[in-house]
Amino acid sequence: MEQVQVTALLDHIPKVHWAPLRGIPLKRRLQTSAIVTWLALLPICLIIYLYLFTIPLLWPILIMYTIWLFFDKAPENGGRRISLVRKLPLWKHFANYFPVTLIKEGDLDPKGNYIMSYHPHGIISMAAFANFATEATGFSEQYPGIVPSLLTLASNFRLPLYRDFMMSLGMCSVSRHSCEAILRSGPGRSIVIVTGGASESLSARPGTNDLTLKKRLGFIRLAIRNGASLVPIFSFGENDIYEQYDNKKGSLIWRYQKWFQKITGFTVPLAHARGIFNYNAGFIPFRHPIVTVVGKPIAVPLLAEGETEPSEEQMHQVQAQYIESLQAIYDKYKDIYAKDRIKDMTMIA
């Protein structure tokens, strides 16, 4: 049976369609370069870090940095944002590659704090990065006074150099301590959580929006505990930039992905898109418009005096209101930005 599945996988590998070496506009080459830079940033940082160890003069500095890396709690306490890095021209090229567009449904009061919940996860949440880790789509202009922190796995902040670059973009750990530290650090401080997580990425396919949301109550508990309003976000096109190989439940691929997720806490979707010199083989995403709609804030109930945790009833009431708002966003824009959909948005878990 497994041999049949492997054969089917090999048969699914596409014939390569090569891109022309000439006649491509400079702006498109710059856009592709920006995407490649971001995708290659992790191995580049690790290679630089290891290469520096070949220079004995730098050993004392590198040893101190490596020790400091394990004790540095910045990723859990708001990070080290550098506005100039978020505003680099590189990110404009990154966003224009697809392109990514940000649509604002309502104002956010800079005196409040917000948990911005992003859907769908996609393969690697490209639009979440473009919108909330950079200023490529003008987030700060549309939401003055709101300071967003895109959250990711804590394990990413154990990687030398790469961790520091991510923090310069305002990115932080998705741990509970990190979330609460950011939300309590002052008015306007907000977090962006890709709510579906690794499980949802395994369902990311063009023309579909299968969400893992029914059992996700952690972000709602967090909002009520900290008095932060919830902001639903939906990106049309996030699932359309990669083709994912068939990984239906019980298949060889599915079992490997679940095993890997259990061991590491994250998973690796087996997907492909295009390459630098071809249009259909590689891990550079397809060019496809991504339109991110930021919904109106949803106020959450306040905890009664002496209470430290919300009740199950409170969380389920807020969840129902949240799903209703998210559905309203999808229904409002689906015939504009998801005309070629195979099916409508579905809550699969």
UniProtKB/Swiss-Prot annotation:
It is a multi-pass membrane protein. Its main location: endoplasmic reticulum. One of its GO terms (biological process) is triglyceride biosynthetic process. One of its GO terms (molecular function) is diacylglycerol O-acyltransferase activity. It holds the Pfam family DAGAT. It comes from the Eukaryota. Optimum pH is 6.0-8.0. Keywords: Acyltransferase, Endoplasmic reticulum, Glycerol metabolism, Lipid biosynthesis, Lipid metabolism, Membrane, Transferase, Transmembrane, Transmembrane helix. GO terms for cellular component: endoplasmic reticulum membrane. The chain crosses the membrane at residues 44-64, 114-134. The keyword Acyltransferase applies. Its EC number is 2.3.1.20. Pathway: Glycerolipid metabolism; triacylglycerol biosynthesis. It is found in: Endoplasmic reticulum membrane. CDD domains: LPLAT_MGAT-like. It catalyses: an acyl-CoA + a 1,2-diacyl-sn-glycerol = a triacyl-sn-glycerol + CoA. InterPro entries: DAGAT. Catalyzes the terminal and only committed step in triacylglycerol synthesis by using diacylglycerol and fatty acyl CoA as substrates. Required for storage lipid synthesis. Belongs to the diacylglycerol acyltransferase family. This is Diacylglycerol O-acyltransferase 2B. It comes from Umbelopsis ramanniana (Oleaginous fungus). The lineage of its organism: Eukaryota, Fungi, Fungi incertae sedis, Mucoromycota, Mucoromycotina. The gene is DGAT2B.
